A protein has these predicted regions:
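Non-cysteine beta-strand/loop elements that form the S-adenosyl-L-methionine
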Residues: 2-7, 66, 98-105, 193-206, ...
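Acidic/histidine-rich catalytic cores of soluble enzymes
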Residues: 5, 38-39, 127-234
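Conserved, mostly hydrophobic/aromatic
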Residues: 5, 31, 39, 58, ...
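Active-site beta-loop-alpha junctions enriched in small/polar residues
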Residues: 8-11, 42-44, 70-75, 105-107, ...
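Active-site mouth loops of central-metabolism enzymes
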Residues: 9-23, 72-82, 114-122, 229-232
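Acidic (Asp/Glu)-rich catalytic clusters
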Residues: 28-33, 47-67, 83-98, 130-138, ...
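Surface-exposed, active-site-proximal loop segments in enzymatic domains
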Residues: 49, 70-87, 106-121, 213-214, ...
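Active-site acidic/histidine proton-transfer and metal-coordination neighborhood
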Residues: 60, 77-171, 179, 272-274
Length: 289
């Protein structure tokens, strides 16, 4: 079973003004202490940019790099998406990663001010994503497109349009898919062959409803506990896993619980304790299959 952690579960995000950022050495050490042996990259500059230094840091903590997340403007030709994808692909390939996870950001670096694209912007986005897939493939990587709150592909309708407009693999993030109004299990049932990477998140639906209604921003909802440890929220994580298994999914399961910190947590508390719960829950559902 291919299971990985991600720095976002320790509050490390690329979003502007997200919160307090823990040092890489502590985050990687806690991942390994919990039993993870793989991780995603984290935001630009979080791990060393130098390939040798990055590999040494990961090896020192007994971890391998499996994927990296890039949020780039894909619908506007004024932004050099191809350059950013090329740079990210080279960085990931030099570290032995397998997947480049791409989201369709808006300029500004926030996930709190999304909007719908017009027809011309949609065509540009689809074309740019197809170009990004070619770039990733040229570096030996799989491109997995990530629907995400506050981006150009966020809602259930956006996801449907994306699946119709491209043949690119999907990063199935159970939290963001649900937040956008779709059921993750339904995506697996109708488009299992498109799932190339998985971010497993659990969601507190009462908080999600406040995001959908506009009562709170996405960032504030994360601070209020939008995401729970796996098995502690309201999503049918076991059902999603079961559908993926029956569909023959062979990729990575990245256990995520996006969080935003204000201070350094006590050792093995906060994010580490939450990640431990998720890993134990995932072990239980995998063990009975």
């Amino acid at each position: 079973m291919k299971v990985a952690a991600a720095p976002i579960s320790w509050g490390v995000s690329e979003a502007a003004g997200w919160g307090y950022r823990m040092a890489p050495a502590r985050v990687l050490a806690e991942m390994r202490q919990l039993g993870f042996d793989a991780t995603e990259l984290g935001p630009p500059g979080y791990l060393p940019q130098d390939a040798a230094a990055r590999r040494e840091l990961l090896q020192r903590h007994g971890l391998r790099l499996v994927a990296g997340f890039l949020a780039a403007v894909l619908h506007d030709p004024a932004f050099p998406a191809a350059t950013r994808v090329t740079d990210e692909a080279k960085l990931l390939a030099s570290s032995g990663a397998e997947v480049l996870v791409l989201a369709a950001a808006f300029s500004g670096g926030s996930y709190d001010a999304g909007r719908r694209l017009d027809a011309g912007e949609w065509k540009r986005l689809a074309r740019t994503v197809r170009e990004a897939e070619d770039i990733a493939s040229g570096s030996g990587l799989t491109l997995a497109f990530h629907p995400h709150a506050g981006t150009a592909v966020a809602t259930a309708e956006d996801v449907r349009m994306f699946l119709d407009a491209t043949h690119v693999a999907l990063c199935l993030d159970t939290g963001h898919i649900f937040l956008g109004g779709a059921e993750p299990a339904t995506i697996v049932r109708t488009a299992a062959d498109r799932v190339g990477h998985v971010h497993l998140k659990d969601v507190r639906t009462a908080v999600a409803a406040r995001v959908r209604s506009g009562d709170v921003s996405y960032t504030e909802a994360v601070r209020q506990g939008l995401y729970a440890s796996l098995g502690q929220g309201d999503l049918d994580i076991e059902g999603v896993y079961d559908r993926l298994r029956k569909a023959g999914y062979q990729g990575w399961f990245v256990l995520e619980q996006d969080t935003a910190l204000t201070v350094e947590p006590a050792p093995q508390e906060g994010p580490a304790a939450a990640a431990r719960q998720s890993l134990e829950y995932f072990g239980r559902i995998v063990g009975v299959k």
